């Protein structure tokens, strides 16, 4: 797959794969249509949906890793263009998209994996550096039964919502 053509679900997946310093596991929710991650980004735990292609809250994890970001003037109607260097990136990269967010995310994936990536590995997986290893259904069930992630904050919660029981 060409990184310049990634959109939606595939772009979300490859951004999660590119954040190997943040994401420990990738899962799929909503009948396999949405990327969900387990990880900790600089001390902030995350356990839930991860949709940077449609959410600046999720895309902020990429923006925070930009060491240099240059936004170019739009040359085509509706097209955004950026040039960026990222922490841990291999080189200065360019990204284009129908929005600045998509251009930024494509540039980030290109900085980690180059101009092309494989198809989405559509099963639960654990990240070890840039490698993804499938997690068996049994391992996923054992984690859920053990409750190791039950008390982690959800990114869907509201700021200031401590989720305490009403008095």
Regions flagged by a language model, labelled:
Residues 10, 15, 41, 50, ...:
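Solvent-exposed, flexible loop/coil residues
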Residues 1-30, 35, 164-167:
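Extreme N-terminal leader/activation tails
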Residues 114-167:
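Intrinsically disordered, low-complexity charged/polar segments
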Residues 49-101, 106-128:
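Positively charged, aromatic-enriched nucleic acid-contacting surfaces
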Residues 1, 5, 40, 53, ...:
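Homeobox/homeodomain signature
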Residues 5, 17, 59-62, 67, ...:
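Intrinsic disorder/low-complexity segments
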Residues 23-50, 77-97, 140-163:
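Short interaction-hotspot residues at assembly and binding interfaces
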């Amino acid at each position: 797959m060409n990184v310049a053509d990634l959109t939606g679900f595939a772009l979300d997946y490859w951004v999660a794969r590119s954040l190997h310093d943040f994401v420990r596991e990738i899962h799929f929710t909503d009948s396999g249509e949405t990327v969900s991650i387990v990880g900790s980004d600089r001390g902030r735990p995350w356990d839930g949906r991860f949709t940077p292609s449609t959410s600046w809250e999720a895309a902020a994890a990429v923006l925070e890793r930009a060491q240099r970001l240059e936004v170019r003037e739009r040359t085509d109607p509706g097209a955004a263009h950026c040039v960026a260097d990222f922490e841990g990136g291999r080189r200065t990269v360019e990204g284009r998209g129908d929005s600045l967010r998509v251009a930024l995310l494509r540039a980030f994936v290109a900085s980690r994996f180059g101009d092309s990536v494989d198809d989405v590995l559509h099963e639960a997986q654990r990240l070890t550096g840039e490698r993804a290893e499938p997690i068996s259904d049994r391992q996923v069930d054992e984690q859920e039964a053990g409750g190791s992630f039950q008390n982690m904050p959800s990114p869907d919660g509201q700021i200031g919502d401590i989720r305490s029981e009403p008095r």
